Amino acid sequence: MLWWKLGRHFPDFAAMKHLLLLMILCISSVQATGRPRLLVLTDIGGDPDDQQSMIRLMVYANEFEIEGLVASSAGTMGELKYEVTKPELIRAIVTAYGGVRPHLMKHREGWPEAEWLFGRIKSGNPKRGRDFIGDGQDTEGSRWIIKCVDAGMKERPLAITIWGGQTDLAQALWRVREDRGGGGLAEFVAKFQVYDIGDQDKIADWMFAEFPGMYYILGRPEEGADRRLTTYRGMYLGGDESLTSRKWIDENVRSKGPLGALYPVETWTAPNPHACMKEGDTPSWFFFLPLGGNKVEDPSKPGWGGQFRRTAEGRYRDLPFTEGRDPRETVSRWRPEFQKDFALRMSWCVDR
């Protein structure tokens, strides 16, 4: 090439060439690693809406670096008669994703291989709550959380989305403090960001006191408020609810290959106008999805994942329900947009 010849005769040009190559490599590295890093804690195995959210996540897998899919205690507290984790439900969805991945690759780049995702499916603690955090309570899931957080940096934090309980995250934090002390804990919490759906293990306030400094969005109404008015319920309540109907799901999701065929058509929560699509956990990862419009550095800004207010303690909470303002609308207002995009991506899962 001409620049190699010029470099022999003009040393300054050779240095310029080296600098240019370095810049290209840096730009390529940024492009390769610019996607949000994501770890999911899911109580999959209770209300089928976790399976719904996981299926949707699979057709957005190219938009993230999915670093962990942790099956925490199945169901919400008291929902099931037994204590169990169900990572096999995640594996079934990833298997179906692997079947449609060749089709997805025709439309976008960056889809992880199913085998790569299998290696990131972990099991957490089948028990939940404060009594199961501490010595002897480490799990495959809590250890994996530590590993993923440690692998990152403050400038590129891990997004931890909690679809179920927080027990495995709390155990990871307890272990880090136990092994590394307060300074090590402070370094650790600076490298992740949390969006918690519902405070299902009822330990959020305890966690804030025990492990200060976390970036933490808590999707939970104020004490005594109607829990149906929580931001994340805008995924299926309010706005154009025809977009959550069985008819819409059959036409746009379940008919689109083996991944869509797994999409459950009945969920457990009432009220739900169609008792079909719920996906109450989806706003947690919508918030970190670049095309969803949210500003991670300022959760008060609008986007698919909702809007939040900063509290005096430094965490983020739902906007209050007032006359003329429903916090669910901060999600439901975007339903035509995010359902249109979901339908498009599901259409990629089949040959045309």
Give the predicted meaning of each segment.
Residues 17-18, 153:
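Hydrophobic alpha-helical segments and their boundary regions
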Residues 26-34:
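Bacterial Sec-dependent signal peptides at the C-terminal "C-region" and cleavage site
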Residues 33-352:
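N-terminal acidic, glycine/proline-rich low-complexity segments
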Residues 18-27:
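Sec-dependent N-terminal signal peptides
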Residues 3-4:
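Tryptophan (W) side chains
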Residues 15-16, 33:
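Intrinsic disorder/low-complexity segments
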